[in-house]
């Protein structure tokens, strides 16, 4: 089993995928989704399929969360903030920041970068 159990009831189910059938499934069933494309025309097309499937299933498309992903790279914090802004403009409700390719040598460097990103993006700790 899962321990400790998540506090959310029911447990949120998030889907990822990059095909029309996957997008339709997300619209029918998912609490959230992980797009496999960046903001732009392809994301807009995917979102339209998710939204249409949600409506067809009697669901509110705006209730389906979306997580955008940004990577900390040579552009550093400025790039993270720029890319997160693009995801927000595209409707992302969540942003994941990946520091694994940043070239950091220690865990503390990753934590410092994520702390800086959280501050720059206006993220507050959960309560």
Predicted regions and their residues:
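Active-site-adjacent structural elements that line small-molecule/cofactor binding pockets in enzymes
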Residues: 1-127
